[in-house]
């Protein structure tokens, strides 16, 4: 008799085998990063990673703006601002960039904690690309800062880059991730 998969509930205490029916339809919609300068961050996420701006929301009384980035085709987005907001919040896996006004020009603002130094917390987001090596060559030509290049370290074929605020982004392709996963126990 074959042993159960490591992914099975019996091998993962606390994991429910069947999600509660009340959660049917739930999905992960966004991850939020606080950013210092929207001009710099929007250029990075659109030019370097190829994301589109799905929706911008400004909150003048509270002095902040939200920029929702993603890989959706914005040609299908409604033109009505309220409908476009609803459309944006119906997309899967968006990145919400939160800009608190004034940080871009504040000489005393030192940036946000990215979670990868003490005290550790949040680690990174991940982006799938067609070919990790070609993508990283392009990133290098664009002057992107690397944490790890695909040939560095023990896990070959996986890279980590930094966005302008120091947040880590894992870069991988599905072929190489299959090979890397094959070495896991």
Swiss-Prot record:
Q: What triggers expression?
A: By stress conditions such as salt stress, water deficit, or treatment with abscisic acid.
Q: Which residues form the active site?
A: 170 (proton donor/acceptor)
Which EC number(s) does the record attach to this protein?
A: 4.4.1.5
Expression by tissue: Ubiquitous.
Question: Which residues are substrate-binding?
Answer: 30, 34, 100, 120, 124, 154-155
Q: Which Gene3D superfamilies match?
A: 2,3-Dihydroxybiphenyl 1,2-Dioxygenase, domain 1
Region of interest (Disordered), ranges? 1-21
Domain VOC: start-end pairs? 27-174
List, separated by semicolons, the cofactors it needs: Zn(2+)
What is the catalytic activity of this protein? Answer: (R)-S-lactoylglutathione = methylglyoxal + glutathione
Q: What class of enzyme is it?
A: lyase
Q: Which Pfam families match?
A: Glyoxalase
Query: What does this protein's record comment on cofactor binding?
Result: Binds 1 zinc ion per subunit.
> One of this protein's GO BP terms?
response to salt stress
What does the entry list as the binding residues for Zn(2+)? 30, 96, 124, 170
Q: Which NCBIfam families match?
A: glyox_I
Name the family: Belongs to the glyoxalase I family.
- What is the protein name given in its UniProt record? Lactoylglutathione lyase
């Amino acid at each position: 008799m074959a042993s159960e998969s490591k992914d099975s509930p019996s091998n993962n205490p606390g994991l429910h085998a069947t999600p509660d029916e009340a959660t049917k339809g739930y999905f992960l919609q966004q991850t939020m990063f606080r950013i210092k300068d929207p001009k710099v961050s929007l250029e990075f996420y659109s030019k370097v990673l190829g994301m589109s701006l799905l929706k911008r929301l400004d909150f003048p009384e509270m002095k902040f703006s939200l920029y929702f980035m993603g890989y959706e085709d914005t040609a299908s987005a409604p033109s009505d601002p309220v409908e476009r907001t609803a459309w944006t919040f119906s997309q899967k896996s968006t990145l919400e960039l939160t800009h608190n006004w004034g940080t871009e020009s504040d000489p005393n603002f030192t940036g946000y904690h990215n979670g990868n130094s003490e005290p550790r917390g949040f680690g990174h987001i991940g982006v799938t690309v067609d070919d990790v090596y070609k993508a990283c060559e392009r990133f290098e030509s664009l002057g992107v800062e690397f944490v790890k290049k695909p040939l560095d370290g023990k896990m070959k074929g996986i890279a980590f880059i930094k966005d302008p605020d120091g947040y880590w982004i894992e870069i991988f392709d599905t072929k190489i991730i299959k090979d890397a996963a094959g070495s896991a126990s």
